[in-house]
């Protein structure tokens, strides 16, 4: 009974948090109210099912329905362009450019009003590799948001937050998101392995995602894409803060795990300095990252899809965060990236300018090497734009 009361009280608090700010109006307001109604039903579903051994199929289905409705109401961006909903502090600029290796295997997503929460946003960038890499990247992009939403709401239903302990609440919220991300990544990787329409045995994808909830961002990284925050230092200069680790095979903790699992890590003679992951007795697959979804040929030999999950409190000094694939970071420094983005007059074009700069840098710094796919999301925390916009452009 006590636990039942805690869950009930929690959901009263949770559902209250879906209230819409006055600045949201028009179509955005109508869409958010529709999502809020859906969220209430999903929350009640979890509350009624607590303690039972039933699957979370109902919750997943509801989360996927929410995603479809968000897309219908232009709250989700999946191509190059930008999204800025009236009443939101967020402005997200997205751009992706195909490299010189064939089809573009990068993809991205921005979901404003994530989980029907007016103060939440989800964004992610995915870098596929292998023969089916572009299909794997898109599959993970489609699966991860709804799976994360489902696991987050289910974890919330099983957690009691003390409203009198603000510091404890912040600590618990992080662990709720971390637990949700760990469950989600395991589920998405398992689902991908069972999905027969995509051959992911020798193909995979990285995944770098961020959830902004109020003034907190939660960052989860699988692979070698990177998130860099731009913040004002005490002396007024804009400085970069790298929020993620590039999970490359040469990192001590990564190579140790791979070697313990009988995998191998070494560089090819024609690629000095580029460490890759190899099977015990074969010169394949030669992955340049130590964590990824898919790539089941080497999952038993040290490659994992476990995310590193971190969080950060956003202050007035923090201006924006850049999420980009290694096609950017191979030729652009963290400092260069934030300078390019901050000096772009039109925030909506920031990602495009960064991607174009990286493409030029490839020609100068990597002559004779085929340019990688280049993709970036620039998420501004304190948007000065006040308009309802979701604009897409061709890649």
Give, region by region, the residue ranges found by the protein language model.
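PP2C/PPM-type serine/threonine phosphatase catalytic core
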Residues: 2-395
């Amino acid at each position: 009974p006590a636990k039942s009361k805690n869950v009930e009280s929690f959901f009263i608090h949770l559902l209250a948090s879906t209230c819409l700010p006055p600045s949201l109006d028009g179509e955005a307001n109508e869409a958010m109210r529709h999502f809020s109604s859906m969220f209430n039903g999903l929350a009640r579903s979890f509350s009624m099912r607590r303690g039972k051994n039933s699957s979370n199929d109902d919750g997943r289905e509801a989360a996927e329905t929410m995603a479809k409705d968000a897309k219908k109401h232009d709250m989700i961006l999946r191509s190059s362009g930008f999204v800025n909903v009236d009443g939101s502090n967020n402005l997200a600029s997205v751009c992706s450019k195909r490299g010189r290796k064939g089809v573009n295997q990068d993809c991205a997503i921005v979901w404003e009003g994530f989980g029907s929460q007016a103060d939440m946003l989800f964004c992610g960038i995915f870098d596929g590799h292998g023969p089916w890499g572009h299909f794997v990247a898109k599959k993970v992009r489609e699966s991860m948001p709804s799976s994360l939403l489902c696991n987050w709401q289910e974890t919330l239903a099983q957690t009691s937050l003390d409203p009198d302990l603000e510091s404890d609440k912040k600590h618990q919220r992080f662990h709720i998101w971390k637990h949700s991300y760990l469950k989600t990544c395991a589920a998405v990787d398992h689902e991908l392995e069972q999905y027969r329409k995509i051959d992911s045995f020798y193909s995979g994808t990285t995944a770098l995602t961020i959830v902004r909830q109020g003034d907190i961002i939660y960052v989860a990284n699988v692979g070698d894409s990177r998130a860099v925050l731009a913040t004002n230092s005490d002396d007024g200069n804009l400085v970069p803060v790298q929020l993620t680790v590039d999970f490359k095979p040469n990192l001590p903790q990564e190579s140790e795990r791979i070697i313990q699992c009988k995998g191998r890590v070494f560089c090819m003679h024609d690629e000095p300095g580029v460490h890759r992951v190899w099977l015990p007795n074969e010169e394949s697959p030669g992955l340049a990252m130590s964590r990824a979804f898919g790539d089941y040929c080497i999952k038993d030999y040290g490659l994992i899809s476990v995310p590193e999950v971190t969080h950060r409190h956003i202050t007035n000094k923090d201006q924006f965060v850049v999420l980009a694939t290694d096609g950017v970071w191979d030729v652009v420094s963290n400092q260069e990236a934030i300078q390019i983005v901050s000096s772009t007059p039109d925030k909506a074009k920031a990602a495009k300018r960064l991607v174009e700069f990286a493409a030029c840098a490839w020609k100068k710094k990597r002559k004779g090497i085929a340019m990688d796919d280049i993709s970036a999301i620039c998420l501004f925390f304190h948007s000065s734009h006040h308009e309802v916009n979701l604009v897409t452009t061709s890649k």
